[in-house]
From Swiss-Prot:
ATP binds at residues 515-523, 537. Residues 27-436 are extracellular. Residues 458-820 are cytoplasmic. Residues 1-26 form the signal peptide. Residues 598-615 are annotated as: CaM-binding. InterPro entries: Bulb-type_lectin_dom, Bulb-type_lectin_dom_sf, Kinase-like_dom_sf, Pan_app, Prot_kinase_dom, S-locus_recpt_kinase_C, S_locus_glycoprot_dom, Ser-Thr/Tyr_kinase_cat_dom. Glycans are attached at residues 37, 58, 87, 115, 123, 173, 211, 247, 256, 282, 332, 351, 404. Residues 345-425 form the PAN domain. The keyword Signal applies. It is found in: Cell membrane. It is a single-pass type I membrane protein. It comes from Arabidopsis thaliana. This is G-type lectin S-receptor-like serine/threonine-protein kinase At1g11300.
Amino acid sequence: MRLHESSSPFVCILVLSCFFLSVSLAQERAFFSGKLNDSETIVSSFRTFRFGFFSPVNSTSRYAGIWYNSVSVQTVIWVANKDKPINDSSGVISVSQDGNLVVTDGQRRVLWSTNVSTQASANSTVAELLDSGNLVLKEASSDAYLWESFKYPTDSWLPNMLVGTNARIGGGNVTITSWKSPSDPSPGSYTAALVLAAYPELFIMNNNNNNSTVWRSGPWNGQMFNGLPDVYAGVFLYRFIVNDDTNGSVTMSYANDSTLRYFYMDYRGSVIRRDWSETRRNWTVGLQVPATECDNYRRCGEFATCNPRKNPLCSCIRGFRPRNLIEWNNGNWSGGCTRRVPLQCERQNNNGSADGFLRLRRMKLPDFARRSEASEPECLRTCLQTCSCIAAAHGLGYGCMIWNGSLVDSQELSASGLDLYIRLAHSEIKTKDKRPILIGTILAGGIFVVAACVLLARRIVMKKRAKKKGRDAEQIFERVEALAGGNKGKLKELPLFEFQVLAAATNNFSLRNKLGQGGFGPVYKGKLQEGQEIAVKRLSRASGQGLEELVNEVVVISKLQHRNLVKLLGCCIAGEERMLVYEFMPKKSLDYYLFDSRRAKLLDWKTRFNIINGICRGLLYLHRDSRLRIIHRDLKASNILLDENLIPKISDFGLARIFPGNEDEANTRRVVGTYGYMAPEYAMGGLFSEKSDVFSLGVILLEIISGRRNSNSTLLAYVWSIWNEGEINSLVDPEIFDLLFEKEIHKCIHIGLLCVQEAANDRPSVSTVCSMLSSEIADIPEPKQPAFISRNNVPEAESSENSDLKDSINNVTITDVTGR
């Protein structure tokens, strides 16, 4: 149990100084020495915090607590009677006859007390709320505190709050414990604590499983925690100040104190840092851990590393093999790995070459390190001379770190982390030294063979090219017929454009005519001789997609006719050129407006609601009302085009799948799509269905309402948070909010949350969504938790788009294309 492992004599005080003003204690004081009834409160001197009775969201129970007074969202940071609520307004907070601060109900039963031994009386002690959020009990004639809430936190850490241990005076760990639910502040399932062993580390523990570790931060080096995910590597820019006084103390302070912020233990098991945004007038998430599946403690067992950017996540360290190969191959990695070749000192005959080290770069260091102040060469030398030593590391602020026994909870990081040296038998080290020579020899021979084959193939191709050109279109339509299983003759009615016609229409595919870039290739605006404007999608030879997607799109869209689907006018197949010709959408794509503060003003709420309805009708046609059942698989704001009347049209069917009438879902090993819009079952397991399109639809709904992009799933987490807090008006784009439409806007947010629920079976069908939008279904169920897919959680997948305007991570793309 982690809470009893601490051996440090220091007190660790976490100073998260995120307030704008520095004031004296005298200025912060807000006193009370009598009693507070249910309707009465006290406020700190600069009105930052308030103390009194409150009711949590969706609850009528009353609790005594402290909350932020200076923000518009109810934010409780400390609760007194957390597991003994009062069911009416009869509660009283008072200083009792023995000088303690107590909370009593209408029958004068004591529900909570500071419970300190004091010689003071009720008349000589006062309660004081400081502007730091600390509630203190003290003698009126002295500045010495008898009791303070900062030493007894509930679920939140504030600036100057004690979060460590004080071994010299026999103190235990100071922890924060989650609420049971957003409406119930009684102790929940998770606890967080800063444990002081060889190095300070933050831990999250599961109270329902013998305080087992859920997550650890990695060791602190004086600047940051080693094991934070890369996206948060710079969040903990604190500095430790060690004061070697009679009590011993360790403090942390922010490098940036210009933002109001605090940490809290979420009831689902995450430690979250919340930062106040004056612009949004709401809290934003500055940090949330665990952040990836690899953050789960011991995810891969012993002697293995976890990499959230790889599939599978876990791999044995070189020189080790799975302990149970069958379980390992089935994705159960908890058994970990075991050493292949014993170390020199472990062999019966310990002669021969000495052991060496394998260097693993940018690692979250394993748990249970021992500390030494040796230099790096001396650190490694000491490890080799100690039979029990299996790994070592050295870094600024860490000194020499040594591991004995086993290595657990290692993770490969892409930017932060520290080099870890794994001790291996000499034969394991030699294996790697020979590998480059072998690879080089194979490559040299391979290059020669490939070159010869290319020359031969080129001569054959040149001879056959003339014969091939006449059959290009025929071959394409044969593939179309095979895929569609339909009427080849009807597909051939699709107009074929000459290459020269499209080249002339697009000004020879000039950059000035380029509208955007997709996985298929570039998209150009064109104008035919008769004056009709068109959009031309040209297959890029460098595209990771291409011919298969072109054929797929012809199959799908040639059979569809709906006012909310983009219209295919024809195609061009000439030599190596493959192009699709669409009607031109003059208003570009939906994302062109939503995520630009100036252009967003052009879409008022009525327009946005009509766009939502149009998208739903188009998707309903694909799923249920057309002759085929089609799953789009790449529904997103940039694939919603707008005509001159701002009528939405779903586009880009290159990734769509046609479903047989008797199937509801399918599985693929080739996960394609756009990060932020992919349903969890599809992103993580390749399983797609109508409900995966519904998830994408829900993301689009929330983006339309908020005007914010779902980057790294932060939008879903944010919406869920404010939904639970009853502050959903803060989500709505200020450009569209109108009290006249408030009920309709709230309904759309509600529907959006239903669409992005984690379990596919919980999501409504598109037909149900349409009925809810039209008020045919009045009783809308409460949503369950959305799927928060961390970017690093998504296995390597193929992107549906490639653009100069993108941030591409793990081949799952965040697109920023202006439309067709």
